[in-house]
Amino acid sequence: MTAVLLGAALTLLALPAATARIGRRLRPSEWARFCAVALAAGALLLEIGLLAWAAPTLLRAVGVPSLASACDRLLSLLTVGGEGLGWAAAVSATILPLVAAVTAGRLRAGRRSVARELWLGEGRTIAGQLVVVLPIDRPLAISFADPEPTIVVSTGLLEALEPHEVEAVVRHEVAHLVHRHQPLLCLVALITAAFGWLPPVRSSAGALHLALERWADEVAAGTCPVERLVVRDALLHLAIVEEAPLGMAAFSPAETVSSRMAALEAPPSPPSLMKHALLYLPGTGASLVAIPALLAWTTQANAVLAMAGRCPV
């Protein structure tokens, strides 16, 4: 059962990377939600699977399992790979939440650090929005929603772009705030920190990041060909822009620029109805397999716990 849970989890985590060719042809908002659900569900299911794998080993270690044959039979249904792999699963199940917690702490600290420096800048209205302009020579455009919605640009960015391009950049950052992208950007950071050593999962996190940036591009540019070229030109001028602090939205992270420029120049044609439906089949299948496995494991685990008091120690 645990092998099924782990298999379904890894399938979901790798799904955005595996289906990116079709997914990029969807509306960026739909593709971003698809990626986010797959990554969040996969990470949660993986943690549950590791805990399920480790549970028999941990129960034996604390003296709960007995030597009675009935208990042994039940425990054998739960145990996969022996004590060694059980302890490895226990360690992994502990490390992953710790990595996530540390990364989440870094995200909060990064946002608060930037917020503390805002007094150095001046407020200015750009594209109808209040923007903080920091005296930094390097081009910079970021936004974050916590502790309060804020858009920050640098004097270097104002000097590097034409006024209408600056307005496009600000509209892009407004889109991130209005559509609540910060939690999803944090999810990208958490998945990358915890699973970035797995290339397919790292690619899936990158797919979500690109989808969020394209989503904001589409809101900023709309359907007007001229405005789409304005956003594209701003990206072109800032193609080697800074990296934003973790969990914040930057206008032009380098790894997303080329794909975004191509989409702005020539929006991809939507996939056929058949391909659109097929995109959702793997994730649906993984979920339909994982849910019965999780229910079966829970039933077996409850049986073990119920019998623990009657089994000889």
Q: Model-predicted segments: where are they?
A:
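Membrane-anchoring/interfacial helices and their immediately flanking loops
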Residues: 1-43
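Cytosolic-facing loops and C-terminal tails of multi-pass membrane proteins
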Residues: 2-17, 82-113, 230, 237-313
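Cytoplasmic membrane-interface segments at the C-terminal ends of transmembrane helices
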Residues: 16-31, 56, 98-125, 224, ...
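Hydrophobic membrane-embedded segments
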Residues: 47-96, 305-312
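Peri-catalytic and regulatory segments of divalent metal-dependent proteins
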Residues: 88-174, 179
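Catalytic Zn2+-binding segment of zinc metalloproteases
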Residues: 174-193
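Acidic/histidine metal-binding catalytic segments
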Residues: 187-188, 226-236
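An active-site-proximal "capping" alpha-helix that borders the catalytic cofactor pocket
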Residues: 210-224
